[in-house]
Amino acid sequence: DRLGSGSQVVNVTSQIGSMVVGANFNDLPYATSKAVMNMVTVQLATQLKEKGVSVVAFHPGWVRTDMGGSSADISVEESAHGILSTLETFPHADSGSFLRWDGSIHPW
């Protein structure tokens, strides 16, 4: 088994997968796929808890990529830095969380 105590599983999702934020987003396949990823996060967190493996879902932000476009809020580097910084101090007790790229809690 490759995942030992202290390992972290990071699922990149989207705020569109949130039941609160994504309810009015008009792209059923995309929203559904992200909602599924959020459930995968919760299920894996439950299954891996006893092994000491943390699982977290991240909304990376509106990122300047081909998909996000040039007017998006943040760069790829800012998003990645925020996620990695959050993971450095992420407590195992919070496994199963849905977070924004900056470490703040995202509503489910």
Residue spans for each PLM region:
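Catalytic loop of short-chain dehydrogenase/reductase
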Residues: 5-50
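C-terminal helical subdomain
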Residues: 50, 57-58, 65, 69-108
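Conserved sequence/active-site signature of Rossmann-fold short-chain dehydrogenase/reductase
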Residues: 15-17, 63-64, 68
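Conserved helix-to-beta-strand junction in the class I
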Residues: 2
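Short amphipathic alpha-helical surface patches that serve as generic macromolecular interface elements
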Residues: 38-45, 55-57, 80-83
